[in-house]
């Protein structure tokens, strides 16, 4: 750590923190919305929590997959900034918004057709089925604004104004909490919607966020100069470039997040209390995931700019720095979680049996968080290098070729019950961290040879 005295090192720490800390604030707000959905639904009843959980677990892989594709705007803009080609940024954002509209139509139509029979096939209790279905319907009103926000936020963040994005999301958070309270518990003369109200509240909040981002990029400098809200005629090679980078990113994220949804489907057979405990522990773990995710997004920006400027040593320096900081912070929150497991469980439920289950699930969550502290930042680094195919194949291997089969084996062969799938998630995340680390080492060696 003696090199911290070096001015260049200090400057890099300062720059990375200036990008990352507001992203953490934004992630806190985003995860806070999920937290309010889960915790308030849980206070309305176990069936409300279970129904909202099932709906959320279905929505999560869908939204992260398509939003992941749209996040291609971030490395594209970062590379253009580094290369001094700012005039091309507007086209990237406009094409992202065009794709956002197309994705929204696809998801809404697909949901109307396939969601009811899919939920029926899960053998849910009637009340849980009803809540899950209408939670998704309520959330559906916010699908379009959710995806339109992604390229706009990518512009704001990549230009270095991550603090502005943070302020927008933090402003929306209390609105979401109030809407949850009013709609879930039936206040201000409105009917009591229970877990369904959480979906409606989140959908409305997405519209509020879109309005705020649209005002920012159209009225404030330096965003106004890019004129990103106008219509664009799709250019074939630009759409192809966007999808070339975005699809592997989105599918890789889908592979990672959908495994949690699939696990929830297998856990559903163990009953409402187990579903509620699983969702409570998973929801809190998602809150913690904001730290490695924030490192991932920040490293995509700083590494992408350095790589676009052909400053390869700078990109390597940010890589090492980001991983060191991520692991250090992970050690702190993992120890705190271990000590505070019971208090965490009490946030979500007062059911003694559910509390005991949550405490065990959190132990398994702590194990995979160590792997996430390595895997998530490396994914962001690789995206900064525009090396997106590696994250796809690593996710496919770790989660679907290893994690899911191991979970099924531990459940059906060794009778480990619901814990089997959490044990397999630990194995999957650790495998992902190892494989991604190897890929990063090989990539940087190849770039170094190119320099020579």
Predicted regions and their residues:
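Small-residue-rich hydrophobic transmembrane alpha-helices
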Residues: 49-112, 146-165, 264, 277-341, ...
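Helix-terminus/linker motif at the lipid-water interface of multi-pass membrane proteins
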Residues: 28, 32-50, 119-126, 182-193, ...
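N-terminal transmembrane alpha-helices
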Residues: 7-39, 43-44, 57-72, 76, ...
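Transmembrane helical elements of multi-pass membrane transporters/channels
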Residues: 18-37, 138, 172, 205-209, ...
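Short alpha-helical transmembrane segments in multi-pass integral membrane proteins
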Residues: 1-20, 77-142, 190-247, 303-368, ...
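Interfacial/gating helices of multi-pass transporter permease domains
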Residues: 41-60, 92, 126-131, 195-196, ...
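Short runs within selected transmembrane alpha-helices of multi-pass transporters and secretion channels
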Residues: 70, 139-157, 165-176, 198-214, ...
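Structural signal for membrane-spanning alpha-helices in multi-pass inner-membrane proteins
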Residues: 111, 154, 180, 184, ...
């Amino acid at each position: 750590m003696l090199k911290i005295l070096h001015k260049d090192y200090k400057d890099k720490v300062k720059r990375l923190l200036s990008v990352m800390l507001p992203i953490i604030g934004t992630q806190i707000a985003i995860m806070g919305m999920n937290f309010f959905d889960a915790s308030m639904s849980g206070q309305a009843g176990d069936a409300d929590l279970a129904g909202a959980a099932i709906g959320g677990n279905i929505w999560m892989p869908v939204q992260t997959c398509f939003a992941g594709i749209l996040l291609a705007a971030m490395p594209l803009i970062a590379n253009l900034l580094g290369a001094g080609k700012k005039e091309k940024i507007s086209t990237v954002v406009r094409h992202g918004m065009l794709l956002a509209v197309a994705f929204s139509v696809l998801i809404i139509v697909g949901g109307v057709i396939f969601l009811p029979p899919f939920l029926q096939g899960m053998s849910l209790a009637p009340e849980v089925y009803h809540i899950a279905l209408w939670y998704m319907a309520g959330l559906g009103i916010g699908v379009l604004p959710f995806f339109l926000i992604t390229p706009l936020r990518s512009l704001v963040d990549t230009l270095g104004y991550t603090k502005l994005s943070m302020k927008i999301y933090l402003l929306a958070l209390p609105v979401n909490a109030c809407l949850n309270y009013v709609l879930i518990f039936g206040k201000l003369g409105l009917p009591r919607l229970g877990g369904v109200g959480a979906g409606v509240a989140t959908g409305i909040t997405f519209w509020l966020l879109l309005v705020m981002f649209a005002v920012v990029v159209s009225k404030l400098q330096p965003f106004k100069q890019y004129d990103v809200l106008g219509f664009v005629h799709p250019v074939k090679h630009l759409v192809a470039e966007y999808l070339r980078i975005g699809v592997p990113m989105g599918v890789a994220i889908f592979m990672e997040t959908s495994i949690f949804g699939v696990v929830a489907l297998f856990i559903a057979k163990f009953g409402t209390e187990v579903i509620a405990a699983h969702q409570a522990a998973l929801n809190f773990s998602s809150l913690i995931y904001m730290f490695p995710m924030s490192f991932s997004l920040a490293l995509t920006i700083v590494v992408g700019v350095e790589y676009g400027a052909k400053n390869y040593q700078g990109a390597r320096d940010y890589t090492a720095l980001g991983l060191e900081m991520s692991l250090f912070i992970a050690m702190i929150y993992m120890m705190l979680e271990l000590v505070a497991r019971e208090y965490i469980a009490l946030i979500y439920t007062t059911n003694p049996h559910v509390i005991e289950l949550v405490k065990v699930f959190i132990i398994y969550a702590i194990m995979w968080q160590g792997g996430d502290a390595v895997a998530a930042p490396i994914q962001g680094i690789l995206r900064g290098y525009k090396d997106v195919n590696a994250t796809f194949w690593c996710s496919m291997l770790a989660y679907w070729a290893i994690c899911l089969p191991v979970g099924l084996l531990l459940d059906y062969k060794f009778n480990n019950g619901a814990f089997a799938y959490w044990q397999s998630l630990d194995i999957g995340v650790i495998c992902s961290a190892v494989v991604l680390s190897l890929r990063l080492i090989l990539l940087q060696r190849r770039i170094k040879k190119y320099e020579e």
